[in-house]
């Protein structure tokens, strides 16, 4: 899907933007469902209490419902991000399999050799692990892929713990808990 739409039809080619759009399309339904479930699990008495205090429906949503649903929303974002970090298949066909040599003196966003260009090919850690294991061009491929997998795992763990701390902090800050 991502290859056909973003690479071929929109003519973005193998690029960061093609990979990002493909991953967004793939993960949007799951994230939407998680946010919807979080908002539905806010007890109706809290909504009614906000309305009984005389605040508008919009203020009830902003000041009562969303702060109460925030841990579930953060969880949904973390789950979707975890899937994105480990995604290799969609990125192989949309973002490419290798990163080009970058010209660090070139800051033109449209140049494919610029480090800030979203139109250049890219290689994520998950794609790197797949590529090292499947091509066999590196003599110590097992060690390189194991090291890359360890870096990816550590990064995901740090991200998850950071997201949990952020969710707890925001929940305490926005609610009376």
Predicted regions and their residues:
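Interhelical loop and adjacent transmembrane-helix boundary motif
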Residues: 91-152
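Generic hydrophobic transmembrane alpha-helix motif, especially the helices
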Residues: 1-20
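Membrane-helix/interface signature in polytopic inner-membrane proteins
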Residues: 36-47
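Transmembrane alpha-helices
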Residues: 31, 35, 57-95
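Generic alpha-helical transmembrane segments of integral inner-membrane proteins
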Residues: 153-165
């Amino acid at each position: 899907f991502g290859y056909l739409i973003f690479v071929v039809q929109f003519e973005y080619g193998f690029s960061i933007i093609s990979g990002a759009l493909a991953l967004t399309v793939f993960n949007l339904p799951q994230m939407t469902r998680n946010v919807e479930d979080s908002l539905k699990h806010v007890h109706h008495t809290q909504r009614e209490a906000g309305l009984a205090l005389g605040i508008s429906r919009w203020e009830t949503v902003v000041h009562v419902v969303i702060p109460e649903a925030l841990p579930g929303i953060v969880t949904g974002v973390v789950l979707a991000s975890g899937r994105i970090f480990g995604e290799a298949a969609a990125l192989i066909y949309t973002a490419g399999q290798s990163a080009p040599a970058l010209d660090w003196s070139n800051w033109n966003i449209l140049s494919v050799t610029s480090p800030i260009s979203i139109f250049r090919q890219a290689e994520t850690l998950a794609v790197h692990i797949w590529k090292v294991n499947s091509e066999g061009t590196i003599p110590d491929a097992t060690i390189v892929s194991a090291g890359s997998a360890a870096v990816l795992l550590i990064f995901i763990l740090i991200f998850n713990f950071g997201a949990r701390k952020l969710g707890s902090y925001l929940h305490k800050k926005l609610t009376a808990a």
